[in-house]
């Protein structure tokens, strides 16, 4: 029954969720208008359209989108914090690759996977193996983390990157204040469900997780989910995530070959077919990473426009939604298409 607790899966089934729905029309209005938007009627219209499309999600939506070649940007609730869910695997990858660039870790370095490394949620390692005894390279584990959002691989990579504190410190060193990484995926899921009695990490295994998760009463899980939505840990602002993606694209925070490796893996992402890429024209190139937990559904990435029209960094977060995942995904897809078409046909402000 481990799928009940998936943090990342297109067909996620929320575990007895009854999150408070706080989305209203007022919640979807932009938190503040930038001077750029105020002087650009086209961006103002796009901002209003994003707010309108957001209501489909049934939750609170945050969006930041930047046309990289011109710097034109639109933001709605851009400074509000949202649970990252598995989108936090992007900053983890950045810190991991930073260590690789410094020679502290090697891509071909083999890492033994122990039974205590098999964690709940999305991916394949915990599904295929219930004991340790295998070894995978850092490159393979990073690919599992980003391609299929494998939580076991993620927690091994988080440890290899130096832990949550090192990831957050790297974000601060880049001048990005909006991203906090504080817990492993296993700890994050346990907090969302309301588990308070997990043993020390070296005694973790799939059976331990299953027993602990199934022991939580529905009313306790509901209360834990509400606390989770208000918790500043493992959150990002749309502006913060967009800033990180912009730096990744410009390849000024990693060695060029490391930045390109990260982008290549993100282009091959196998999750979230109905999100950012869901309504984009067939063949549109997008490097992205999704995230899902409870009432949260996210997708962040870089869209390549056709006909040399440039690139768009976009971060879309949905939180506190009681609607089914499909409705949240539809909102993300419609917002992405609106942003795509706007910057394709109006790359510069009208005179």
Regions picked out by a protein language model, each given a short descriptive name:
Residues 1-9:
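N-terminal secretory signal peptides that target proteins for export/translocation
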Residues 11-24:
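Bacterial N-terminal signal peptides
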Residues 31-193:
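Active-site-adjacent loops and short helices of periplasmic peptidoglycan-processing enzymes
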Residues 29-49, 53, 226, 230-351:
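Structured C-terminal helix/loop/strand segments within mature extracytoplasmic catalytic/sensor domains
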Residues 83, 178-254:
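Active-site-proximal helix/loop microenvironment
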Residues 72, 128-130, 223-226, 316-318:
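A short small-residue
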Residues 2-3, 24-30:
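N-terminal acidic, proline/glycine-rich, low-complexity intrinsically disordered segments
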